[in-house]
Amino acid sequence: MRNRAAIIGAGVSGLTCGVVFAERGWDATIFADETGQKTTSGAAAAVWFPYDAEPADKIIPWSLITYGRLRELACDSQSGASMLEIWQFTRVGLVPIPDWAKNLGARPISVIPSEVEGSLTIPAFPSLFSNGYALNVPLIDTTIYLDYLANRFHNAGGTIESAHINKVEEIPRDFDVIVNCAGIGARELFHDSQLEPHRGQVAIVPKLDLAQAIVCDDAPLMYAIPRTHDCVFGGTNSISENREPSAADTTAIVSECSRVLGIEAPPVIVVKVGLRPFRKSGVRLERERLSDGRTVIHNYGHGGAGFTLSWACAEEVCAIASRTS
């Protein structure tokens, strides 16, 4: 008889765990009251990048493993994954190229002619940025990828049940393991005061002729991410519980992205808001034995790196579960 796994949450972490468990022979069920574009994952720009998550000594190895998995998926035209060059800029001073980025082939960008061998000189944006670096990374079109994961999960025998889990005791006892991918919801579900919501708002605009993703983490935070059928303008990152779109934020986002790209402000198709589940003490990926004897494996607190960490964390969760059962 197959081991049974109950997974709480249908964002990218929950769906990826579901795929890994189901494809490794588990009888897996996902419990979630929000799916697809209604999840926090649906509001993500979803460019692979270790962003807004701790600790670095775990985040970077997990990110690199997931980089490899997503690069493989980019070969499947149905997955919603592709490879894209990202230009990471700074407005003041120099942006250091992290060692992990160098190992992936990152090269410096200068807005003025550079004597650095292998550097890329960008004539655009000279008055806006000082320098940056270019790197090829996986890009996830969430409008395709989340459905791809859900279909892959179903095809492997998995089930998604619509349910709002208020307490873990509501999970039927005939499951061998419970996997907690509740994101910011883990704060109430498991009384974790280390979680704080980092609010992100984006504006989806019509598709632009943009060959690269443009990102700047300096204030004001901005990014323009080209996708299959549209473009994501962002963004915000503030500690807030507010899931409602802010008209002022939308105006600021579209204005800054348009200014950087040197274009007229495009019409906004839709505005999305998500609460990044940042955990002050770092991503929680560990096994816990509940007072009733059941096993929970936590997988949450990924901050702004949910897609970036998804496959490595899911594989580690499944490995822990396999040793437990």
PLM feature spans:
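Central helical "cap/lid" subdomain
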Residues: 34-37, 163, 169, 176-217, ...
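Short beta-strand to alpha-helix junction loop
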Residues: 55-65, 132-148, 244-248, 308-309
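Flavin-binding catalytic cores
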Residues: 72, 209-211, 228-230, 238-279, ...
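Glycine-rich FAD pyrophosphate-binding loop
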Residues: 23-42
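C-terminal catalytic lobe of FAD-dependent flavoproteins
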Residues: 148, 269-325
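Dinucleotide-binding Rossmann-like beta1-alpha1 core, especially the glycine-rich loop
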Residues: 45-129
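N-terminal Rossmann-like FAD-binding beta1-loop-alpha1 element of flavoenzymes
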Residues: 4-29
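Helical element adjacent to the flavin cofactor pocket in flavoenzyme catalytic cores
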Residues: 133-166, 172-175
